[in-house]
Amino acid sequence: MKYVVKLGGAALENPEIFMACARAVADLVKDGHQVALVHGGGVQLTRTLKQLGKQSEFIAGLRVTDAETRDAALMVLSGRVNKSLVAALGSLGQAAMGLSGGDGLIFRARKKRTVPDLGFVGEIVASDPRWLEAIWKMNAVPVISSIALGFDGEYYNVNADEMAAACAAACRADALVFLTDVPGVRGADGTIMRWLTVDQIPVLSQTEVISGGMLPKLGACREALLNGVKRVRILPAEAAHVLPDLCSARVTDGTEVMAS
């Protein structure tokens, strides 16, 4: 089977959870699956920007990205975070290749048109998964940072959830899994929803049951399902160990998002 796993949030900060996620990915490959690992790094980027004396601003869960912030994102996401994940997989004996979405023209972006303007924030408009296929043939894991190249030659910061959905659609993944720092999607009563359909997402958004970073995440879930991805699940990163059992056993952690 073909998996796209998105890792972000505090999972990248906690050494134990970080390694548990890497181990789960390595176990999937050991079991014969093809895995692409897409990552964010918003916490690390915010910290670096603060060290540079720059405040972070978010609108509807998306980071406002001027040229300086974009350059910092290139450094942090495609550099420090990406190579840390490659190293973690390598320490487990699993070969990995670190990439940005712009490498090999795997993903092409255009500036996201929003009001107010978000700056160098992009959305994926084209993809070419041949590099991913080549890496999989070597029994390795492509590790992809959420940076993509525009047709104008500029790099764009892409929401990592949206990047993961685009990756899953491009390679026709059997499953897209978001490993995150929340236990799942909370309903109006505050309890974790074990499943929801794409038709429920606009309603939950309009009633403000979901907000902040969960908005683009659920939007990404919807796009993935509408573009042929078979399964989408939001899973707490501390439950990453269930990944190898996701399609062969009953898993109750997190929230399953379904097409209908």
From Swiss-Prot:
<feature type="site" description="Transition state stabilizer">
    <location>
        <position position="217"/>
    </location>
</feature>
<feature type="binding site">
    <location>
        <position position="63"/>
    </location>
    <ligand>
        <name>substrate</name>
    </ligand>
</feature>
<feature type="site" description="Transition state stabilizer">
    <location>
        <position position="6"/>
    </location>
</feature>
<keyword id="KW-0547">Nucleotide-binding</keyword>
<comment type="pathway">
    <text>Amino-acid biosynthesis; L-arginine biosynthesis; N(2)-acetyl-L-ornithine from L-glutamate: step 2/4.</text>
</comment>
<dbReference type="GO" id="GO:0003991">
    <property type="term" value="F:acetylglutamate kinase activity"/>
</dbReference>
<keyword id="KW-0963">Cytoplasm</keyword>
<dbReference type="GO" id="GO:0005524">
    <property type="term" value="F:ATP binding"/>
</dbReference>
<comment type="similarity">
    <text>Belongs to the acetylglutamate kinase family. ArgB subfamily.</text>
</comment>
<dbReference type="InterPro" id="IPR001048">
    <property type="entry name" value="Asp/Glu/Uridylate_kinase"/>
</dbReference>
<dbReference type="InterPro" id="IPR001057">
    <property type="entry name" value="Glu/AcGlu_kinase"/>
</dbReference>
<keyword id="KW-0055">Arginine biosynthesis</keyword>
<keyword id="KW-0028">Amino-acid biosynthesis</keyword>
<protein>
    <recommendedName>
        <fullName>Acetylglutamate kinase</fullName>
        <ecNumber>2.7.2.8</ecNumber>
    </recommendedName>
</protein>
<feature type="binding site">
    <location>
        <position position="157"/>
    </location>
    <ligand>
        <name>substrate</name>
    </ligand>
</feature>
<dbReference type="GO" id="GO:0005737">
    <property type="term" value="C:cytoplasm"/>
</dbReference>
<dbReference type="GO" id="GO:0042450">
    <property type="term" value="P:arginine biosynthetic process via ornithine"/>
</dbReference>
<dbReference type="InterPro" id="IPR004662">
    <property type="entry name" value="AcgluKinase_fam"/>
</dbReference>
<keyword id="KW-0067">ATP-binding</keyword>
<keyword id="KW-0418">Kinase</keyword>
<dbReference type="GO" id="GO:0006526">
    <property type="term" value="P:L-arginine biosynthetic process"/>
</dbReference>
<feature type="binding site">
    <location>
        <begin position="41"/>
        <end position="42"/>
    </location>
    <ligand>
        <name>substrate</name>
    </ligand>
</feature>
<dbReference type="InterPro" id="IPR037528">
    <property type="entry name" value="ArgB"/>
</dbReference>
<comment type="function">
    <text>Catalyzes the ATP-dependent phosphorylation of N-acetyl-L-glutamate.</text>
</comment>
<dbReference type="InterPro" id="IPR036393">
    <property type="entry name" value="AceGlu_kinase-like_sf"/>
</dbReference>
<dbReference type="Pfam" id="PF00696">
    <property type="entry name" value="AA_kinase"/>
</dbReference>
<keyword id="KW-0808">Transferase</keyword>
